[in-house]
Amino acid sequence: MPIIAVISKNNCQFDDLENYVLPLLYQYHDETTRLQLKNKLNDYLWEIIEPYVTFINCQSDIFMETICTHLVKEFPDKKLDDFFYHTESSFSFPKKHTELMYCQPTWSYQKDQEVNMNFIGCLFSLKHNVIENTCIVIANNYDISTQNNIVIGDVTKNDILRMVRRRYFFSAELIKNDTITKYYYQNPGYLVSKVFDLKEQDTIEKLTVGFLKYNLSFYCNQNKNQYVNKIATRINGLYQLYGDVLVLNEMDEHVYTNLSTHELRRLNVLAYGRLYDRQLKADEIHEESHVEVDEQGKEIEKKKTPLWSKYIIIDKRMSEWQNNKNKCFYCNKNIEKPVVCNKCFRIKYCSEKCQSEYNSYHSDDCINPKSITN
């Protein structure tokens, strides 16, 4: 039975949040220290929000009825038909995406009264809608074996905490040699200056590349006297990058979202191959219909690609990669000792002979020669 989270109306305020968030930001932590700091933050958040969060097991055959019944519990004298019901996408994660459900009375009702506010629900509304009374969080797990690629899943305590945290800071990844390290931040510019120890007059190189619905921003000094960053070069696919490289996921101009170590590692292995293969196939483009109301009050149906669709693309490609990860790009035989292109680091061969025979085809797809050390 799927588990939903029922969020009662509340006036939750996180007055001491800075004391728990600031120690996490803009600096390197080993995994043990980072988990300790996150657990302290989680304990603080949960102590405040726990009285308003209830997890409910829903029978599949009365799933929507159960949801609607809990949404209208503040109005025991009203019927289910006395409300408009709204569903909007909320935060998405590598294994699931969440939706927020709430209702709106159809009768004359005074909105925006503080006594009816659901402040946790307001945090979860990415459309910045004002959420009143009870709201509900639903989880959708990605499942590429199903027709729609998603199935109703369980909402957990960890999901709720992650959703709250997402409102206050993001994660980026630093690629240093062959390791990937997580950094937390609120201000991306300040993170870049801290990681690279920039002074006021210093500059930094930025390269933005789209890859499988991610919009990755690579920051580096691009000093060719430093080592070639193989992982960053492989993932961006276009230029050799040098030294330590900081990677952020910039959804839109100055709009950032999380980039986890797990996600970047998966992008790293999926970066092997031709640049042409990065293009999305027709069956990989997932669109959902939604209704908008124009200035004349007319409803218009539009199609939109949801942000979480990139996780389904990645899951499908990882499944394909598992079957081909040890194959020579040229002859398709199993690789015992890989020979990797030492410029783009994207193409693997089983022998130098295969590399030589494919070289004339690969040269146009390889790295930009202007970025290579002389």
UniProtKB/Swiss-Prot annotation:
The lineage of its organism: Viruses, Varidnaviria, Bamfordvirae, Nucleocytoviricota, Megaviricetes. Gene3D superfamilies: 6.10.140.2220. It comes from Acanthamoeba polyphaga mimivirus (APMV). Pfam families: zf-MYND. One of its GO terms (molecular function) is DNA binding. PROSITE patterns: ZF_MYND_1 (PS01360), ZF_MYND_2 (PS50865). Zn(2+) 2 binds at residues 341, 344, 362, 366. Zn(2+) 1 binds at residues 328, 331, 350, 354. Signal peptide: none annotated. A zinc finger (MYND-type) spans 328-366. InterPro entries: Znf_MYND (IPR002893). The keyword Zinc applies. This is Putative zinc finger MYND domain-containing protein R331. SUPFAM superfamilies: HIT/MYND zinc finger-like. Keywords: DNA-binding, Metal-binding, Zinc, Zinc-finger. It comes from the Viruses. Disulfide bonds: none annotated.
